[in-house]
UniProtKB/Swiss-Prot annotation:
Keywords: Cell outer membrane, Cell wall biogenesis/degradation, Lipoprotein, Lyase, Membrane, Palmitate, Signal. CDD domains: LT_MltC_MltE. It catalyses: Exolytic cleavage of the (1->4)-beta-glycosidic linkage between N-acetylmuramic acid (MurNAc) and N-acetylglucosamine (GlcNAc) residues in peptidoglycan, from either the reducing or the non-reducing ends of the peptidoglycan chains, with concomitant formation of a 1,6-anhydrobond in the MurNAc residue. It is found in: Cell outer membrane. Its EC number is 4.2.2.n1. The gene is mltC. This is Membrane-bound lytic murein transglycosylase C.
Length: 359
């Protein structure tokens, strides 16, 4: 089975923030999306040629994947399972190649806009506090901040944890590092102040923002999707991003570097939640019913939510207002045409309960 994390060369199909449809003025969007599809196709083909058909691995919403060394070496962080895998098919001194990749990964900074995940460029810059600081402990149980400790840990891994396997014509050398058990909480806490500012600015419950961030990206600031949704809240430039810019009186759409900035991404994603909450779905009177609709719309679009109840938007709102929140939830999780959106409401609603105690 192909080891593909985030490759699906299909244009989005629904208006949403993290989902799948061009806006009504979609010519620019389609052109941009087609360009991204071409880039992804070329990149995947390149990886397949180098690593083999069963070893295609590409960055996704919850997976950081960075290639180096002429694409012969890669670092993969699965932010959902909490596992780092660093591997190489280099034939000349693979241990030293792995050591350099281990150190680079452990010390990388937290600026996603500076890293090109679709090249083998050596563009990962260290910082005073690495992004993984506190999420990885070395063999002595200590967090890793500086080069000396990172190199010592790399040497330990190569001496004690080096693995070798064969795939096709390649021998793959690798090491695996486990993140600490509470790695998700540690990443979430990095963004709490940003979430609280956005919550206050737009009147959106911070527990909802956090639940969407966890569901969308597992708090991976490098997150990218097959439809080119970006960052922590998986914002799409030409749909949600454009709506937010219009609401702020700004021209155009947010750039990729803009959306890879964690604070700007959280601000944009939260502003879009506010648009859904107060404008597109603002006529829904019951706050719980409206929250269910907003969550589903963040994934699949407000139009698809309302069409469950009626093809007429005003009539759809009237029907929702005559229903209990439980009946609205049941309709959204059972009758929405997208299985992904049906699951999305279930996931976010359950996850939000875990964050309601955070203040």
């Amino acid at each position: 089975m192909k080891k593909v994390l985030a490759l699906a060369l299909i244009a989005p199909l629904l208006i949403s923030c993290s989902g799948k449809k061009p806006d009504s003025n979609g010519e620019e969007y389609i052109k941009d999306t087609n360009g991204f599809d071409i880039l992804m196709g070329q990149f995947a083909h390149n990886i397949e040629n180098i690593w083999g058909i069963n070893e295609v691995l590409i960055a996704g919403p919850k997976d950081y994947v960075k290639y180096s060394d002429r694409y012969l070496t890669r670092s993969h962080i699965n932010f959902e399972t909490g596992q780092i895998t660093i591997e190489t098919i280099a034939t000349l001194n693979p241990a030293e190649t792995l050591r350099q990749a281990i150190v680079t990964t452990l010390l990388m900074g937290d600026d996603p806009s500076s890293i090109d995940l679709y090249s083998d460029a050596n563009d990962i810059k260290p910082s005073r506090e690495p992004f993984l600081y506190g999420q990885v402990l070395d063999n002595t149980g200590q967090p890793i901040r500086w080069s000396g400790r990172a190199n010592s840990f790399a040497d330990y891994l190569l001496q004690n944890k080096l693995m070798k396997r064969t795939s096709g014509l390649h021998v793959i050398y690798s090491v695996t590092i486990q993140l600490v058990p509470n790695h998700l909480d540690k990443r979430a806490h990095k963004y709490l102040d940003m979430v609280r500012r956005a919550s206050e600015r737009y009147g959106v419950d911070e527990s909802l923002i956090l639940a969407i961030m966890q569901t969308e990206s597992s708090f991976n600031p490098y997150a990218v999707s097959r439809s080119d949704a970006l960052g922590l809240m998986q914002v799409m430039q030409h749909t949600a991003g454009k709506d937010v810019f219009v609401s702020k009186g700004k021209w155009g759409t947010p750039s990729r570097s803009y959306l890879f900035d964690p604070e700007k991404n959280i601000d944009t994603g939260t502003a879009y939640l506010a648009i859904l909450q107060n404008t597109y779905l603002g006529g829904i009177q019951n706050t719980t019913s409206r929250r269910y609709a907003v969550i589903t719309a963040y994934n699949g679009g407000a139009g698809s939510v309302l069409r469950i109840f009626s093809s007429d938007k005003g009539q759809a709102v009237n029907i929702i207002n005559q229903m209990s929140p439980g009946d609205v939830y049941e309709a959204l999780t059972q009758r929405h045409p997208s299985a992904e959106s049906r699951r999305y409401l279930y996931k976010v609603n359950n996850t939000q309960k875990n964050y309601r105690r955070i203040r």
